[in-house]
Amino acid sequence: MTRVWRFLFLAALAIPVNVLAAPVSVHNLRLWQAPDNTRLVFDLSGPLEHRLSTLNDPERVVIEMEGARLKDGLASLDVSHSYISAVRAAEKSDGTLRITLELRRPVRPKSFVLRPAGQYGHRLVIDLYDEVIARASPSPTPRAAPPARQVMAPNDLVVAIDAGHGGEDPGAIGRRYRTREKDVTLAIARELYKLVAATPGMKPVMIRDGDYYVGLRKRIEKASGNDAEIFVSIHADAVPGRQAHGSSVYALSLRGASSEQVRVLADKENAADLIGGADIGEVDSMTHKVLVDMIQTATIGDSMVLGADVLASLRGIGSLHHVKVQQAGFMVLKSPKIPSILVETAFISNPDEERKLRDRNYQRSIAESILKGLKRAMPRLIARRGGETLQAVVPTPTPSPVSPALQSAQAAPVSTAREHIVKPGETLSAIARLYDMHVETLRFLNGIQGNDLAVGARLQIPARSSEL
């Protein structure tokens, strides 16, 4: 009897561990197509080990998952608009699930796993990057600093428009109509893109223009790579209950949030990478340098002023949830040099506001309000650009063309040292009207909390705040 047990024990040791363990179920497969890559996401019942390899003639990518079993077939997967021509699956005798992707073109594959987050459990993510695009894209070369005593003639002001969430990350879901935040933000972003494109002196850049996910750090990199001077991230808020309503504007804070509610919102938005799918190995490698750079510049202050202009414009189409620009540690706003704001357009958790967010006319109204705020801030942003590059007034031999709108804005005084001395009987609102600026902007620039003004107080006034 002892010999029998010994034989069974030794036989058990010879069996691979992945055969003894309960197989991990691969129970769903989704595909997202971005401009430069195809993303495949496998839903898993638990964690697993996997291997990734490529084969040529014809081009294929092979994914091997140890101790896995395909629960559902692959026939329903639509690959017609992706880099993949067909998907095949086979289960090997050792318990390994082999997925073969037949390709339309050469790709550079990359894989990573995601732990449970939001509505998702364990996931395996496969990104297929276009090999042709990757080879054609040269490595970025450092820009030479402008020679001393040279004036840099400005071009159009580049506005980066970021539609929040996307792809795997639907964002908040409306209660009544099941509206997805990612769809609403993309619709508003596209409306804003058209309006900015039609505005003299401005040029729009879309961070995402389809139903795919872009990592939070990648959004910043894309804005910077396109020389953006404004970054606007569009969202639709959600909270428990149905009563919360109104728009809000947020800027970055390095020292905590404006309130506990704002901190919770920032935590929720920052979790987008966990839900949408970003390789954590690529995130935050430059965080320390970024924060140091931001402290050395006035980017956060510029963001607050920009936010106040946009917030005041949003007041014209509905109520405000916060009457002042709020601050928290939003990852997507951590650009070292680009004034950046996050606009929560409305509460998708409020049935009435959810209905409005689905309406194209309302989407356009929101976009128009954001544009109005951007136009109000435009002269100061042009002045900010000049302050960064202007070293001496010496004409360049062949200046670049400048749009009429920017010529007008550039002609305005660039000094921000103007002061207003408060006279008896003057109020904040009266002074704001005098200089064609918003009260909130005046409050922020001068650190004013209430409405009381001391006679003789010196208030800082922006160089120019009028509408274009």
What are these regions (language model features)?
Residues 52, 63, 126, 240, ...:
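Active-site-adjacent mobile loop/cap segments within catalytic or ligand-binding domains
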Residues 1-9:
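Bacterial N-terminal signal peptides that target proteins for export
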